[in-house]
Every structure is written in C-alpha cells, then in structure tokens.
UniProtKB/Swiss-Prot annotation:
EC number: 1.2.1.41
Family matches, as SUPFAM superfamilies: ALDH-like (SSF53720)
Pathway: Amino-acid biosynthesis; L-proline biosynthesis; L-glutamate 5-semialdehyde from L-glutamate: step 2/2
The protein, known as: Gamma-glutamyl phosphate reductase
Family per similarity comment: Belongs to the gamma-glutamyl phosphate reductase family.
Function: Catalyzes the NADPH-dependent reduction of L-glutamate 5-phosphate into L-glutamate 5-semialdehyde and phosphate. The product spontaneously undergoes cyclization to form 1-pyrroline-5-carboxylate.
Keywords, alphabetical: Amino-acid biosynthesis, Cytoplasm, NADP, Oxidoreductase, Proline biosynthesis
GO molecular function: glutamate-5-semialdehyde dehydrogenase activity; NADP binding
Chief location: cytoplasm
Length: 422
C-alpha cells in the first residue's frame, strides 16, 4: 500500500524548493522533458498501444479510446507544448498592484506558487505531461493519479519526467505519481489537506462528483458542459458551415466540441440543408427538433443524412461523439434562454450583426464566448497559454483554460520605515 503521507510530505518539501529556483532551471527541466519524450517515443507509444488494446477489448467507447490514444503526431505536440511553456514568461515573482497608504506603508502583491497540486485524471495520458509542465513552470509540486486504463502510458511518461528533473537539478519528488489502482487512494488524496493545496480532476462527471463529495482540499471543477453555436440570418452561411463542421468533427471527444446547434428560424430553410450535407460527409448523426426535421426531411440529399428525432435530454447532453443536437429558435432571446439553461462551457455566435454579437458576449454566462469562431478555440494552447491543466467551470479562483497564472496566487508585501499602526 502506498503511503500518501510520505508522498504528500515529499511534495510539500519539493514545493518549497521549487518556489525558489530560477526560471532558467525550470526551463531546462521542461526542455529536458520534451527531449526525453521524443527520445523515448517508441517506448511510450508501445506502452500506450497496450493500454489502448486493453480498452478496445473491454468495449470502451470510441470517444474515450481516442482520448487515450497517443500517436507520433500527438506526442510531438505534447513535447512542443512543453517547449512553449518554457518560452512563456515566468509568473512567479511578478509584482503588481503597488500602492502607498496614508500611513506610509508601501504595499504590493507578489505572485507566488500555490504549493502542491493533486491531479486525478482518466483516459488522458497527455495530461501527465501537460499538468507536470505547467506546475513546474509555476513553481508547484504535483501528485499525479492517472486512471488504471492508462497505467502503462503514465508510467512511461513519468519515467521521462523523473529523469528530466534529475538532469536539471530539481527535486525528484516535484512530480510524483500514484501507481496503485486502489480507488481508496483517491479518497485519501482528496483529504490530504495537510500537504495538498488544490485538486484538479480531469475526467467524466462521475469523477468530478466523487471529488467534490469527498474532498477537504479545494477542487477545481471543469472540462464538462454542453457547448453551443447559434447561427443568425445575418451570418455568412458559406463561411459559417466550416466553422460548425470544425467545432463538431475535428475532435468530437473534446470538451469544447459542439453539442447543440441553434439556428434562427429565418436562417433555417437555407442554412440547415447546407450544414446537414457538410456534416454528413463525416457521418455525424443529427438529432433534430420537429422544426429542423421538417426542413431536412424533404431537402435534396436527405436520404444520405443520419436524421433522428431529438429527445428532450439531447439538448442537455455532452455527446463526446459524432452526434449533434439541432434546434430552431425564433430569435436571439430564445437562443440566450436555451444556452442559459443548458450551456456554460464554450459558446459561439455566427453573425454579421455587431449588436447581436455584443449582446451575446455580454449576456452568455460561460467559460469562453466566441464571435464567428469555433468553440474548439477554448483551449490553453490556442489561447497562447502553452497548455492547460483544465478548463475550469468554477467561478472562484480560475475560470476557463487554466494556464500558468491560474496556478499561482499572491502574497501581500508591506514595507515601511519602522512603522507602527496608529
């Protein structure tokens, strides 16, 4: 049985050291990780292939298998993201909010690491490196607990990370992995508040619920939610169709993939057949409300489209597959009401009307809102953050893609000339 107390104590000690090391030393470790991933590519991909084969034999859904899969291209992207994190400005030590008080006290905030991060994740071997890289750059130690379904992949990548830390002269316990599949260890990690400062779960709704219900450590909830695109009559339909297709098919298992398409009634007769034909090329199943179904059922080429009547539950569902729900709405008010009821993750409007765009961005409550752009942009790499540890749907501490700055907090610093309080 793994001793989590020891792991936590080692992480806390490592975090104190990381908070003091130079940016150059942290960057050296990140480049060493990237180099190691490429040098050990065959070993990592072989381990991942074994994980994927087990998952396929067990009947794991294709969307989950896709999340598990590492390829040469994906591994190269992970390594490149690591280098991008090294190139980003180091937030630790930043001075901001300077002021001088009437008492003569000179006050400012200094950005500091959070401390020890616990990461619990399923079916996402890339998370091992993404979280480790960002935590290291932000001066945090991290305790990783990957799912048993990716155990070989996690072991292969954490070996690379450990070697890189040693090569860069950083504490080897700055990144630790819990390899025992016993779920009780997850519960213990969630309650290790003596050492762990924040928990970041990356997985399905059941994992997030388990973390929230069992944690005494603050939990960042995110990565789940229904994403919408609303299409107005003023949109350029020819250019809007590729945006919808990109949002749905580029990576359907991603949390920022399109789930529900809302189309203004005045746009529906022309736009719906256009987008249905484009989505059909990728075998996307269309779950349509009655008005959408009536328009598409008689459209040219409909016999090649996967049309299904939508169930009420489809409009609150994160599909994570080549399925999209489609609904015709009467106006922007109805679209906003629908998104308020079901959305909150990644929301977009396709429009040529600046007033509608401004209203949409002002009234939609979500982690990210886009005008004439795909929901797939809600991503740390796309935002220039290098990578992200999560896309938080929390309102407190961080919201949206969590990059370096979101992995820090601050300390108030007060300086005086032997000041006493009056």
């Amino acid at each position: 049985m793994i001793d989590l107390e020891t792991i936590g104590r080692r992480a806390k000690t490592a975090a104190r050291t990381l908070a003091k090391v130079s940016t150059e030393q942290k960057n050296a470790a990140l480049h060493a990780i990237a180099d190691g991933l490429l040098a050990r590519q065959d070993e990592i991909l072989s381990a991942n292939a074994a994980d994927v084969a087990d998952a396929e034999r067990a009947g794991t859904p294709p969307a989950i298998v896709d999340r598990m899969l590492l390829t040469e291209a994906r591994l190269a992207t992970i390594a490149n993201d690591c280098r991008k994190v090294a190139e980003l400005p180091d937030p630790v030590g930043e001075i901001f909010d300077r002021r001088e008080l009437p008492s003569g006290l000179r006050l400012y905030k200094r950005r500091v690491p959070i401390g020890v991060i616990g990461a619990i994740y399923e079916a996402r071997p890339n998370v091992t490196v993404d979280i480790a890289a960002l935590c290291l750059k932000a001066g945090n130690a991290v305790i990783l607990r990957g799912g048993s379904d990716i155990a070989r992949s996690v072991a292969a990548t954490t070996t690379v990370i450990a070697e890189a830390l040693e090569q860069a002269g950083l504490p080897i316990f700055a990144v630790q992995s819990i390899t025992d599949p016993d779920r009780e260890l997850v519960r213990q990690l969630l309650r290790l508040d003596r050492y762990v400062d924040m928990i970041i779960p990356r997985g399905g709704a059941s994992l997030h619920r388990f973390c929230v219900e069992n944690a005494t450590v603050p939990v960042i909830v995110g990565g789940m939610g229904v994403s919408h695109i609303y299409v107005e009559p003023s949109a350029d339909f020819a250019r809007a169709v590729p945006v919808v297709v990109n949002a749905k098919v580029q990576r359907p298992g991603a949390c920022n993939a399109l789930d529900t398409l809302l189309v203004h009634r005045a746009a529906a007769p022309v736009f719906l057949p256009m987008v249905a034909a484009a989505l059909a090329e990728y075998n996307v199943e269309l779950r349509c409300d009655l008005e959408t179904l009536a328009i598409l059922a008689d459209a040219p080429g409909h016999e090649n489209w996967q049309l299904r009547p939508a169930e009420p539950a489809d409009f609150g569902r994160e599909f994570l597959a080549l399925i999209v729900a489609i609904k015709v709405v009467g106006d922007i008010d109805e679209a906003l009401d629908h998104i308020a009821q079901y959305g909150g993750h990644s929301e977009a409007i396709l429009t040529g009307d600046p007033a509608s765009a401004a209203r949409f961005t002002r009234e939609v409550d979500a982690t990210a809102v886009f005008v004439n752009a795909s929901t797939r942009f809600n991503d740390g790499g796309q935002f220039g953050l290098g990578a992200e540890v999560a896309i938080s749907t929390n309102r407190l501490h961080a919201r949206g893609p969590m990059g370096l700055q979101e992995l820090t907090t601050y300390t108030w610093i007060g300086e005086g000339d032997y000041l006493v309080r009056a």
